[in-house]
Amino acid sequence: MKALYLAVIGMILAGCQSLASDDRSSIWFRMPPGSQLVLHRELDIPAQRAHIMLQHGQPLTSASEFDVACRFEVRDLGPRTIRPDTFLITGYSSQREWVNYPYSKRYYKTLRLKSEHQSGILPMVCGYSDWPWHGRPVTQAEIEEALGDYFSFRFAR
């Protein structure tokens, strides 16, 4: 009886263990608080737009919805040039939502950004659409591939 009791307690405690991971290719990756997103090159936001897309390391005005792309957005319409900067990541979350029930779902991560030098920076959203039974959360590695050499991450320790 005592062994059964200990086994049940062990299973309960194991169920409380976090799935958080340091592996950037894992869907369970957790952004350490205090991490930063570093912009290495200027990003030009075109006239009459308030965002620029990045996919496969290239800035675009629109992107394929079936490959991971990141939308860097500002409050006011362009034209505007975003200068190289370091953004504090103040929040990081993973979501999914139906786009066309029951055929497609959007999987995305939202990074809330803060700049000491540039105003009007809105959260960056990185995601893609897929069939609900094929899709899975966006990984950190996929975000890094979408951003290419324009951005890099500095993870807090």
What kind of feature is each model-predicted range?
Residues 117-157:
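C-terminal partner/receptor-binding element of secreted or periplasmic proteins
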Residues 35-64:
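Post-signal-peptide N-terminal segment of Sec-exported extracytoplasmic proteins
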Residues 75-90:
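Short coil-to-beta-strand transition motifs
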Residues 5-14:
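Bacterial N-terminal signal peptides
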Residues 91-100:
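Short, conserved beta-turn/loop elements at beta-strand boundaries and strand-helix junctions
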Residues 65-77:
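N-terminal post-signal-peptidase region of extra-cytosolic proteins
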Residues 32-34, 82-86, 106-108:
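Extracytoplasmic
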Residues 17-20:
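Bacterial signal peptide processing site
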